[in-house]
């Protein structure tokens, strides 16, 4: 809570009173944004009538200050990945998973019962680890319902990453991406141990920093 309060104080100090209100509103919407099955950032979830022209600068401030991490949608799993980015579609993650947990007001005891948030918390944790390793954050969705949590570039190759909060790891979305773009190797982060099967590298969540 103290860290959150210091962030809010910094918003007022460096962004000015008027802008800091919108910045705080955008930041406070993150738990709602991430808890949704479709967790693409939606301005309307900040408040009724909110739109990019009103809050775009506030989002940029949060990103530039390092308070949030931006993950941009890529429309194709092809190189160069940056050429296929849809800059209007993105997700925002907390730069600190502890802050996300604090904003959800979850305790160690209640965390196990809040299963609807486990996927979001897992994604947020992985986003932080990938960013710390210097990767640009992207994700992919098909025109249907398929979605790959993260898409990165390793040694000039597109590598999709799937995050699972448990040991159940089957993913039609990952399979669809691999077949569509002839991907040589994928990464799956889950509660399972290290392994390699069907060109999928299995990495336990605790070792996400190894990616």
Q: Model-predicted segments: where are they?
A:
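C-terminal helix of von Willebrand factor
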Residues: 205-211
